[in-house]
Amino acid sequence: MVCFRKDMEIADFEYPHKINLTKHVEDYLIEDENEVSNLWIDRKDMYMKENPDNKYSCKPIRLGIVNKGGQGERIYSVKGTAITLSANGGGVFAKTGGYYINGKTRRLHPRECARIMGYPDSYIICQSQNQAYKQFGNS
């Protein structure tokens, strides 16, 4: 929805053309397993879909849940788009959501969040991981 004040007398507004999405979460992932080793999550109360679709999508693809499946407790495919990053929130995958990567689940690394939000790899991320998640969740 787009609104203008009547006194502005704007009559020729046109919506911008649709932009097709070409990237998915997997395009932003860090390749070095050692750099993300502390982000892997393995819990007994993790429930995955039995036959997940392996297709690409321009939407987030939910594959499973942890606990009751609240915010921060959902598991997504890297073949979809990223869910909204959050500056606040809890759950085992707080602030980034969980992603199923190479047969395991994990949160996103702050660098991956930065990439998703459009920051270049040259951008210096603060030392505090929690503060970095808040920054990118507020971007």
Mark where each language-model region is:
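Short amphipathic alpha-helical surface micro-motifs
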Residues: G64-K68, Y99, T105-R107
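Short linear functional motifs in flexible/disordered or boundary regions
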Residues: D12-F13, G97, S128
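Class I S-adenosyl-L-methionine
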Residues: M1-T84, N88-G89
